[in-house]
Regions:
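Flexible, solvent-exposed coil segments and beta strand-coil junctions
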Residues: 52-57, 77, 120-126, 156-163, ...
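Short loop/turn motifs that connect adjacent beta-strands in outer-membrane beta-barrel proteins
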Residues: 31, 38-49, 64, 83-107, ...
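Outer-membrane beta-barrel transmembrane domain signature
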Residues: 82, 146-148, 167-255, 262-270, ...
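Transmembrane beta-barrel strands of outer-membrane/channel proteins
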Residues: 50-58, 87-89, 111-115, 160-166, ...
Length: 294
């Protein structure tokens, strides 16, 4: 198996494993489990390709909530003209760097765009809802990272990355950055496991918008006033298991996935009355979905 094909497949699955753990697509078999896959020269992953799909996820009503809502989400991932299109929660990120053939280490960098709907809709708690809905944020920023290929065997990868983004719609009007680490390994030609850990750091504008309780909000909801400050507000751990229905990711087609995610609110993200009095610092979510690659 050429090393370049391993790199292409790891880039494919790593790009799909970042949707907070996001969607992933299966990769190649571990030699120790299945033996090397037969040579192929027609892999869809070695040329322009697009994956589209849909999933359903049970997630907290807002960040810090102990109520859950069922939400559908779209999936878009691809590679067009040498540019990788990778999913983000509520948006996409582009990787403008071309991987080197057979490289042990690859780099990624490019812009990202997304929206944030935290407390902008579907607030189940009546007290939090009485404090008022917030505006949708539109976030622009950049993403960059490094991926180490062939860490424990020929087909796995370990990635370190960071996103930084700013709200440009005048909602929280601040900055967020998130470092993360992820590990992707295939267990068979059709079965992939990805695990991820990340943390989030927010500035004062973000903290005040989402975590503070103003006098007006206190009067409307009965919650005590609270003045939030920036800092680390969340850590996240997730895993995803993906199964390719044809038995080989390289021929495209349909794949299904199951994901689970654990988050813990920190500092003022946990101390705000929206979490401490009306919610829970422990945040759980899980989902299923299907995607098609062509």
């Amino acid at each position: 198996m050429p090393q370049h094909r391993n790199t292409v497949t790891n880039r494919f699955v790593t790009g799909l494993a970042v949707l907070g753990c996001a969607v992933a697509s299966p990769a190649l078999a571990q030699e120790s489990l299945e033996g090397p896959p037969p040579p192929r020269t027609d892999s869809i992953l070695q040329r322009d390709n697009v994956s589209i799909g849909v999933g359903a996820i049970l997630m907290p009503s807002y960040e810090g909530s102990d109520d859950h809502v069922l939400t559908a989400f779209p999936i878009v991932r691809g590679r067009l003209g040498g540019v990788d299109i990778n999913p983000r929660q509520g948006g996409i990120a582009l990787d403008l760097l071309t991987d080197r053939r057979g490289a042990k280490i690859d780099f990624s960098a490019g812009p990202l765009v997304g929206i944030k709907l935290n407390r902008a809709r579907r607030i189940k708690d009546p007290v939090v809802r009485a404090a008022g809905k917030l505006d949708m944020a539109v976030e622009l920023g950049a993403s960059g990272g490094v991926r180490i290929n062939r860490v424990l065997h020929k087909y796995d990868s370990l990635s370190f990355a960071a996103d930084v983004k700013w709200d440009v719609a005048g909602a929280y009007s601040g900055m967020v950055w998130r470092p993360q680490v992820s590990y992707v390994t295939p267990l068979s030609p059709a079965l992939l496991v990805a695990i991820q850990a990340s943390a989030r750091h927010v500035d004062g504008n973000y903290a005040r918008y989402y975590y503070s309780v103003s006098p007006a909000q206190s009067g409307a909801s009965g919650l005590p006033e609270f003045n939030a400050k920036g800092g680390w507000d969340k850590v996240n751990f997730g895993t995803i298991v993906t199964w390719d229905l044809s038995g080989d990711v390289r021929d495209g087609g349909f794949a299904t996935f199951v994901l689970a995610n654990y988050s813990r609110m920190l500092n003022d993200g946990a101390d705000t009355p929206y979490t401490a009095l009306r919610g829970d610092a422990t945040q759980l979510m899980g989902g299923v979905g299907i995607a098609y690659t062509f």
